[in-house]
């Protein structure tokens, strides 16, 4: 894949070269999207809109740290949707990992989560965030145990992954109406990079065939059900809906 590769002063240029080789990235200075190695992390920038800033994965500080420490924990909608109860902590495959936020919430509660990501740049960002989290004194030990990245297409993983998970979680890219600064920023950068998940409807059937317990699909509250298939049940929040489907 062609993308502009930049190394900031103080960062390791050889590390950027190794990263490009690992993920099959080819430097192209004409590309709008830039993958930038800073002295502290890897981030994605949309060069024609510098005010959007960089997008990167951070499980240690910022929003995710606050959510881990002060969020709803088992009371979060995603936790309810996957079926967490008392001593039951399902094994989860997040087949559309993205920045790994919901996967992190589930892992912080105690679930083992295998994250599947097919886009090389997004996978590189996610791996960078995981590596830094693995080294953290507070969360590193359980992060290494509970959060793993699989670089593969969702369709491929849903037919080949082993062992079989209790829950398959899907959060396909969908156009957002909200004007939230965070969502607007990330959606504009991400959609410029990966576009919409136009094959998302085709993931529901293999997900239902794979899961031992249930499939959970996160949707904006205004969106139709995935594949136009009515859900068995739903957990709703202010802006989203977690549709629940039984396994086949």
UniProtKB/Swiss-Prot annotation:
Disulfide bonds: none annotated. This is Ribosomal RNA small subunit methyltransferase J. The keyword Transferase applies. Belongs to the methyltransferase superfamily. RsmJ family. Coiled coil: none annotated. GO terms for cellular component: cytoplasm. It is an enzyme of class 2 (transferase). Its main location: cytoplasm. NCBIfam families: PRK10742.1. It comes from Proteus mirabilis (strain HI4320). Keywords: Cytoplasm, Methyltransferase, rRNA processing, S-adenosyl-L-methionine, Transferase. S-adenosyl-L-methionine binds at residues 101-102, 117-118, 153-154, 171. It is found in: Cytoplasm. InterPro entries: 16SrRNA_methylTrfase_J, SAM-dependent_MTases_sf. Specifically methylates the guanosine in position 1516 of 16S rRNA. The gene is rsmJ. GO terms for molecular function: rRNA (guanine-N2-)-methyltransferase activity. It catalyses: guanosine(1516) in 16S rRNA + S-adenosyl-L-methionine = N(2)-methylguanosine(1516) in 16S rRNA + S-adenosyl-L-homocysteine + H(+). Its EC number is 2.1.1.242.
